[in-house]
A protein has these predicted regions:
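Short, charged, surface-exposed hinge/linker loops at domain edges
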Residues: 1-6, 34-70
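Short aromatic-glycine-(Arg/Gly/Cys) micro-motifs in beta-strand/loop hairpins
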Residues: 9-21
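Intrinsically disordered, low-complexity regulatory regions of eukaryotic regulatory proteins
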Residues: 19, 28, 63-64
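ATP/adenylate-binding site constellation spanning eukaryotic-like Ser/Thr protein kinases
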Residues: 20-23, 41
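A short, exposed loop/beta-hairpin motif centered on an aromatic-Gly-Thr core
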Residues: 24-35
């Protein structure tokens, strides 16, 4: 299931820096805009997976999963 997030990006000197608006701590810095977007995408996917593993580990062994829509 694909989700959409908002990347906030800006150029600062010779660097591009960016953040994922909806997820604290997901930020990157790269030399080009294309590299930045790719790096944000990878970092976001890793952050979501790590958070998922942490949540499941904390809730184990007995838990249920529910979808929540905002």
């Amino acid at each position: 299931m694909a989700n959409t997030y908002t990347a906030v990006t800006k150029q600062d000197g010779g660097w591009w820096i960016g953040w994922i608006e909806e997820v604290p701590g997901v930020n990157c810095q790269e030399r080009t805009h294309d590299e930045l977007v790719a790096s944000l995408r990878t970092t976001l996917a890793e952050a979501i997976e790590l958070n998922r593993q942490d949540a499941l580990g904390a809730a184990a062994p007995d838990y249920t999963e529910e979808l929540v829509t905002v």
